[in-house]
Amino acid sequence: LLVNEYPTVLEEMLIREPGRYFGNPSAGGLGWGMGAALGAKLASPDKEVICAIGDGAYMFGNPTATHYVSEAMKLPILFVIANNARWAAVHRSTLSTYPKGYAAERDKPPFATLEPSPRFEHVVKASGGHGERVTEPKELMPALERAMKVVREEKRQALVNVCLEVSYVK
């Protein structure tokens, strides 16, 4: 099961069965993905659950509580964070409201930057999970494989913090 709170081209996904993909609700709700992943695992304990989420949504999703519940209820979930060290939603809405405003003139828009980026992989470790930070493309697949091994074999939660290039829309 894939709980996705990150922009995705759904047509590129290889998901063919109904009920295997849960995407952004039309009503919004930044941070909903982590709680939804817990619910998906509770509803389908025999299925693997992956939560793909941006760094801003991860922070909004109350990660300490999520990882605590995952450990306490023995819900092995893989969390994959696309970490570009910014709140894209905040930046986009600010630019749409004030296209020539203060934020549009800055290299690092106020209230949209998440730099320095927290070490999210440490948050999951506080609740008995496996956490890794990926900074190079060649590290990604091995990190995902190690994380899935923890989820499948050790029945623990895992998190891969994928650090992306920081960029801002002008």
Predicted regions and their residues:
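Thiamine diphosphate
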Residues: 9-170
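Active-site pocket-lining segments that scaffold enzyme catalytic pockets across diverse folds
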Residues: 1-3
